[in-house]
């Protein structure tokens, strides 16, 4: 039976641990130059409604490493962008491909793709969640901290799609989660309620120093995401005191790791000093997107 991953909650704690173990193994094999052609003659269709650097390159490289093939399907270049229904697109692509990855504006799009396709569908970013990002993040945390339990994960900034997945993922693996957002930018109540139902321990505050106090992980993201450009001026004012800088790091544990899903707006949500400093694991985190997604593709498509 096919499995889709549209939310981090589509994976159990056990499945997350299995994926991270697989990702670390695949990372070692890649560094050693070992062949991993596990998906020879298999094809992954990649539907993009939003521009991307890390998502596109990492998924394409993943399929190349596996001896398979990836097809970049920009929504402007296929009929889905000219009025063909998502339902018909899903059914058609199911006859050609072995998996679909979709980076979309609306979460409803990936839900429909999953419902009407007979092949696995991966959410590579929607307006609600970004499970692939969190798998790469959790791999990075495991590499640096070797555990999830007894860790405090502090999110500073917008309670956006990545924050939603981080909140829910932390609840699944047993990390304490603290989010600091300006009033009105908190994660939506449905995500907080879901985290609670998963046994999550979390706090929501509008004071970054409260969230970051004794944190093991500090995470930030852009203040103005794709689609929010009309609010740029307003957001830059409201988020001005939510910058991850040296002063804020001083409130966390000395061995805190700093994370960012990228792309970053240096000088806004994070300073150069922190991004390029000794606590930053941001570029290892970016690399781990590749390995974590390889593990996920392999689980769903092998």
Curated annotation (Swiss-Prot):
PROSITE patterns found in the cross-reference section: CARBAMOYLTRANSFERASE (PS00097)
Where is the protein found, in the record's own terms? Cytoplasm
Q: Mind listing the GO biological process terms from this record?
A: arginine biosynthetic process via ornithine; citrulline biosynthetic process; L-arginine biosynthetic process
GO MF entries: amino acid binding; ornithine carbamoyltransferase activity
Q: Which family does it belong to?
A: Belongs to the aspartate/ornithine carbamoyltransferase superfamily. OTCase family.
Where does this protein hold L-ornithine? Answer: 161, 221, 225-226
Pathway assigned in UniProt: Amino-acid biosynthesis; L-arginine biosynthesis; L-arginine from L-ornithine and carbamoyl phosphate: step 1/3
Q: What is this protein called?
A: Ornithine carbamoyltransferase
Keyword Transferase applies: yes
Q: Which InterPro entries match?
A: Asp/Orn_carbamoyltranf_P-bd, Asp/Orn_carbamoylTrfase, Asp/Orn_carbamoylTrfase_sf, Asp_carbamoyltransf_Asp/Orn-bd, Orn/put_carbamltrans, OTCase_ArgI
* NCBIfam families per record: orni_carb_tr, PRK00779.1
What is the species listed in this Swiss-Prot or TrEMBL entry? Methanosarcina barkeri (strain Fusaro / DSM 804)
Q: Name one Pfam family in it.
A: OTCace_N
Main localization of the protein described in the UniProt heading: cytoplasm
Spell out the reaction equation it catalyses.
Answer: carbamoyl phosphate + L-ornithine = L-citrulline + phosphate + H(+)
Keyword Amino-acid biosynthesis found: yes
Q: What does this protein do?
A: Reversibly catalyzes the transfer of the carbamoyl group from carbamoyl phosphate (CP) to the N(epsilon) atom of ornithine (ORN) to produce L-citrulline.
Q: Give the GO cellular component terms, alphabetically.
A: cytoplasm
